Amino acid sequence: MTDAALALQAENLRMTFGETKALDDVSLSVKPGEMVALIGPSGSGKSTLLRVAAALQVADAESGPVSVLGKTMQQRGKLSGRVQRNRIQLGFIFQQFNLVGRLSLFQNVLVGALGRLPTWRGVLGIFPDDVKQSAMDALTRVGVESFAARRASNLSGGQQQRGAIARALVQGAQVLFADEPIASLDPVSARKVMETLRELNKDDGLTVVVTLHQVDYAKRFCDRIVALNKGRVVYDGPADGLSRDKLIEIYGPEFETAFEGGDA
């Protein structure tokens, strides 16, 4: 990776499901250290864009290349032969936390180190002391160290989600994709998760791209917002430039009723 490498570069992405164009010639670039929100109505393509960028879904053959930190993830409808290696510095946070419920939070976070350890260590569950320390440091960093020994299934959604963020830190992620990370959380837990992401972005320089349904959170925590509608980018600019009129254009006339009393 060179100093000039973008955290994310996607060119002319297309993704179809039957007759539906989930992504319709979408291009997006994200600089290292940015925190970017992807917003838009349900079905607008924001989650699909994130999954294609992470090479969790394969775009159509007519699509251009996708790279993360200068390393190709896929192009022309084919995954890179080195996609597993290229994902090492990319963390992905899912809406449903993706933790193993029977394992402790600490054990779940240790899993983040598997990509850089010999296979036998993962099979036997034997982790070096420095990895164990990094896992505890990561839990402390996101504010859930006191729950390290508790089974993930016994934690709240917000605690699990912050544990998932800690796992990405142990992985060594420089770029973090978060797909609707607060969609199933109560307001207090949602705020804590977004504050954690913002602190990691500001203090550690972690690049964050997050899909959100909550426009007020996008405007509060992200400097840049990219809005999609029907698979196309309809806004890409600063959060403070996203006016109510533009939001009505993005979401439709129901926006004012649906978001009445909000911060948008």
Curated annotation (Swiss-Prot):
Keywords: ATP-binding, Cell inner membrane, Cell membrane, Membrane, Nucleotide-binding, Phosphonate transport, Translocase, Transport. Belongs to the ABC transporter superfamily. Phosphonates importer (TC 3.A.1.9.1) family. CDD domains: ABC_PhnC_transporter. The keyword Phosphoprotein does not apply. Gene3D superfamilies: P-loop containing nucleotide triphosphate hydrolases (3.40.50.300). ATP binds at G40, P41, S42, G43, S44, G45, K46, S47. It is found in: Cell inner membrane. The lineage of its organism: Bacteria, Pseudomonadati, Pseudomonadota, Alphaproteobacteria, Maricaulales. One of its GO terms (molecular function) is ABC-type phosphonate transporter activity. InterPro entries: AAA+_ATPase, ABC_transporter-like_ATP-bd, ABC_transpr_PhnC, MetN_ABC_transporter-like, P-loop_NTPase. This is Phosphonates import ATP-binding protein PhnC. It catalyses: phosphonate(out) + ATP + H2O = phosphonate(in) + ADP + phosphate + H(+). It is a peripheral membrane protein. Residues 8-255 form the ABC transporter domain. The gene is phnC.
